[in-house]
């Protein structure tokens, strides 16, 4: 099972360059995490910069991590807009969270549907909502079977490595209860890297940045 900051049943989205290595992640909908709105901020926190040849102290394998800055979500239901904003910023596009939320139809009581978030992401990044055929773009899929040897997990890890190596972050929907005891609901974060096992044959850990203002660290931001 992939460890570190990843749920046992994760939703993810990957940018793919062709149909043979098409998408990844979520048939379910993005939901809010029931977060308090009292300390919302638009602060950008620099993320840790790590050379992709570093050895991880736990797995002993190669670590690859994109140098992306955390954008903290402004409102309790803005996890998807903030995540998409980070992905766009990593590609040199600056789009305000409020604008993205409006385009995605982010709801005051629910949050954002993943399908809407990915359409808006593709629109800004590639110029179309839904990629077809061999077109590059983010697509949705689900890791329905979390077992490490399942086809779902193998496909996820293969595409994770491909996308991070190509410089494209991942769009994750995580189960809050798996990552943060006492919390509930689904939550969007941006996947920024991975660590391989010592022999390089498998993914041991994944890294993500969490836009929630409830989990920001003074040094590492949402990492």
Provide a role label for each language-model segment.
Residues 1-19, 23-135, 199:
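Active-site-adjacent structural segments surrounding the nucleophilic cysteine of cysteine proteases
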Residues 99, 103-223:
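Conserved active-site-adjacent core of cysteine acyl-enzyme catalytic domains
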């Amino acid at each position: 099972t992939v460890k570190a900051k990843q749920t046992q049943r994760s939703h993810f989205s990957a940018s793919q360059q062709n149909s043979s290595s098409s998408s990844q992640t979520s048939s379910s909908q993005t939901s809010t995490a029931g977060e308090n709105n009292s300390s919302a901020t638009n602060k950008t926190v620099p993320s840790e910069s790590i050379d992709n040849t570093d050895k991880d102290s736990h797995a002993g394998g190669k670590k690859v991590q994109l140098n992306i800055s955390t954008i903290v979500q402004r409102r309790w239901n803005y996890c998807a807009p903030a995540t998409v904003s980070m992905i766009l910023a990593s590609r040199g596009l600056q789009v305000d969270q409020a604008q993205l939320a409006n385009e995605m139809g982010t709801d005051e009581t629910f949050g954002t549907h993943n399908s809407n978030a990915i359409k808006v992401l593709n629109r800004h990044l590639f110029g179309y909502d839904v990629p077809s055929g061999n077109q590059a773009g983010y697509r949705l899929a689900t890791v329905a079977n979390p077992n490490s040897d399942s086809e779902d997990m193998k496909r996820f890890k293969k595409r994770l490595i491909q996308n991070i190596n190509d410089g494209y972050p991942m769009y994750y929907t995580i189960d809050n209860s798996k990552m943060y005891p006492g919390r509930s609901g689904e939550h969007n974060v941006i996947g920024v890297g991975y660590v391989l096992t010592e022999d390089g044959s498998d993914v041991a850990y994944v890294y993500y940045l969490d836009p929630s203002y409830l989990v920001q660290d003074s040094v590492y931001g949402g990492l």
